[in-house]
Amino acid sequence: MNLPHDGLAQPQRGWAILTIAIGLIMSVMDGAIANVALPTIARDLHASPAFSIWIVNGYQLAITISLLPLASLGEIVGYRRVYIAGLLLFTIASLFCVAANTLTLLTIARILQGFGAAGIMSVNMALVRHTYPRAMLGRGIGINAMVVAVSAAAGPTIAAGILAVGPWPYLFAINIPLGLVALVLGIKYLPHTRPAGHDFDWKSAVLSALTFGLGLAAIDSIGHGEDAAIALGEFGGAVIAGVLLVREQKHMASPLLPLDLLRIPIFALSIATSIASFCGQMLAFVALPFYLESRFGYSDVEIGLLITPWPIAVAFAAPLAGRLVEHYPAGLLGGIGLLLFALGLGALAMLPTHPSLFDVTWRMALAGAGFGLFQTPNNRTMIAAAPRERSGGASGMLGTARLLGQTIGAALVSLFIARFALDGARIALFAAVGFAIAGAIVSTLRLSQAGARGAEYVRVKEDQRMKGE
């Protein structure tokens, strides 16, 4: 087995990048397309809206509870094995989704899809780190960030297009050929990594699943206005499981919950920046369709087209940021990017009464460009701050931070709309501005002496490892 010490050589690197991108496109987009199809699926399968929401919730819950355990498993058995297993499960589950003729069967298939998606998401950044030479890591993460952002933003539009020409099973059928192609490429081209010398911690995996599963369920319950006793019980259970998890993990050398990485100042600050920014992003993503429809009367098709400049701007900004981070501090780039993001969101919240096409599109593009400028340097910092052998823990924590921020953002939109009716969408945009500014402030803290020391410590350790010291 040939282990890469500083990335893969071409053409293997190119094929590995394509494999990682296909898996990410499928897993991220499937989280977005189901929302659009929910009314159609519920009507076709004769299900109530309350029950049909589990098509979305089951997928998200499976990812939430398994991201960190699968990232830890990737360190133990090898990242490519976890990634390929995730691809295989995701593809098979997609076939089950196509064949499902009841809501119960479809929900079970979606939960299986979620576990497969977690296998893909949990180790994808670790694979990127082992695919690219260290000097090109920022560019690799830029491409990765572009794929994630564009897939998430374009998912609803693509779903609407598919539903316009075919039934809802087509949404899941498209994953089958893509998954098979990715499996063939992955087996041949993904990098091998050296397994860690410790066993999988089943007890911590269960506690982690309870902590994040119950925690995000509590946030969702609050957002949807469910009984306060239920939300309080879920939150209390999450706190108890979390305390037990930390006690179990705090003395471990390679903990499933990466406490060792969170002790590195620049890593912890990057995680906090990520949570705040993705909260702002999801506040905007969920609120914008309501805002544009209720306030300005745009149709669903028009809204999809008006939002398109956002992912296009991300597609340009994220790879550019990947090159800039090789020359400028991530804290500075992230701070500037999130301030631009905040300006774009604020400008959208203050659109004129009768906006022109240009009025909307330049604001969308500014928000997308700002987010793209932030995301790549932030992700690179999180991955590079971890010792190479802890890439899995960093990758899993990156995905968990993103999911946590998005869940909080979506719950807040529900809360604002329930409390303030149609004005809630505009209030949500102003809240998104606040989270973006908070993220910018935290990002610039990485320029402090403590943050610099954390980054320098990791660079020294990495240089020593590369030189065999």
Roles of regions detected by a PLM:
Residues 1-12, 446-469:
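Intrinsic disorder in cytosolic terminal tails and internal cytosolic loops
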Residues 164-273, 306, 432-433, 466:
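Hydrophobic transmembrane-helix bundles of small-molecule transporters
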Residues 22, 150, 154, 158, ...:
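Hydrophobic faces of alpha-helical transmembrane segments in multi-pass integral membrane proteins
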Residues 65, 119, 210-213, 283, ...:
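Residue-level signal for the membrane-embedded core of alpha-helical transmembrane segments
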Residues 13-29, 34-38, 45, 49, ...:
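12-transmembrane solute porter fold
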Residues 2-188, 317-321, 325-328, 332-342, ...:
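Transmembrane-helix bundle of Major Facilitator Superfamily
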Residues 98-105, 187-190, 219-225, 246-250, ...:
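Transmembrane helix-loop junctions and nearby membrane-interface residues
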Residues 59, 106, 197, 310, ...:
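Catalytic tyrosine of NAD(P)H-dependent dehydrogenase/reductases that use a Tyr as the general acid/base
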